[in-house]
Amino acid sequence: MSNDNKRLPIGKDIATRRRVARKARHFRIRKNLRGTAEIPRLVVHRTSRHMHVQVIDDTIGHTLAAASSIEPEVRAMEGDKKARGAKVGELIAERAKAKGIETVKFDRGGYKYHGRVAALADAAREGGLKF
């Protein structure tokens, strides 16, 4: 009798292992990273198609500013996902500065600081945010 028809237990397929490993990395990062009203947390979430970023005050649990690649001005852009990530970084820097936020703690969400995540962070820095 072959085991081909049996379902694999959770964590045995590659996608699940990667997702669980990213979550574990994010928990390790979050253990020591808390956003305050003075220095909020800049959180990145990445999907296969889009990027979302929020500036969060963890003491009260409120989102102070947000930007996403789903927004019309980013969707209308030509270029690759890295360029769209950079545009999202510019948007979040602009919106955070409008709310009086100059300095943030960067929470990469367990993702590698590479590619779209790095492009977003660099664009936010160029937009005037300090990490």
Curated annotation (Swiss-Prot):
Keywords: Ribonucleoprotein, Ribosomal protein, RNA-binding, rRNA-binding. One of its GO terms (molecular function) is structural constituent of ribosome. Pfam families: Ribosomal_L18p. Disulfide bonds: none annotated. Coiled coil: none annotated. GO terms for cellular component: cytosolic large ribosomal subunit. One of its GO terms (biological process) is translation. The keyword RNA-binding applies. SUPFAM superfamilies: Translational machinery components. This is one of the proteins that bind and probably mediate the attachment of the 5S RNA into the large ribosomal subunit, where it forms part of the central protuberance. Belongs to the universal ribosomal protein uL18 family. PANTHER family: 39S RIBOSOMAL PROTEIN L18, MITOCHONDRIAL, LARGE RIBOSOMAL SUBUNIT PROTEIN UL18M. Part of the 50S ribosomal subunit; part of the 5S rRNA/L5/L18/L25 subcomplex. Contacts the 5S and 23S rRNAs. HAMAP family: Ribosomal_uL18_B. This is Large ribosomal subunit protein uL18.
